[in-house]
């Protein structure tokens, strides 16, 4: 029960996004616990028979992962011709994940390995992160010259890591977060 005793969920604001722009179900907005869980446990071994680890895994799925999916879906819904994709990778190869990510891309770009990402990150930039990116690993279909060109354009248009630090979360709600993410997406 460590996870539920340590964190005070009474301060979590529940907000219904009901503007014409972002019709939504009832969903808590991100809070510091959604970021802290990755800072505290990201990269650590997950023991499937350990009750504490099971609770942490459930928390990650129910809160930061669900909120990331909601964020991405709302952004994709706001951009004609875009869709989102998210794998529920709250743990990888027996270790807690370092982040929650969802991809948003034009339907026609699905197999081009170029996309926007939104989510919680604890590794490079701690907080909520949104950016234009591309598949950088060996599985990428992009040739090296295209990867270099993508990097150049991302820097040139300031589409790299945009971070909202945990200390700034009180300045945001779903509408504001979705709007700034959509604005970034529309610059491409």
Residues covered by each model-derived region:
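Residue-level detector of short, conserved catalytic/binding motifs and their immediate flanks
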Residues: 114-116, 128
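Short glycine-rich, low-complexity/disordered patches
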Residues: 2, 77-89, 156-170, 187-188
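Charge-rich, low-complexity N-terminal segments
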Residues: 2-113
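Conserved, charge-rich beta-strand/loop surface module that forms ligand/interface-binding patches
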Residues: 99-103, 107-109, 115, 144-149, ...
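Compact, glycine/acidic-enriched structural inserts
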Residues: 124-173
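Residues that form generic nucleotide/phosphate-binding pockets
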Residues: 74, 78, 153, 180
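Short beta-strand micro-motifs enriched in acidic
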Residues: 119-123
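Long, compositionally biased interface segments
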Residues: 173-188
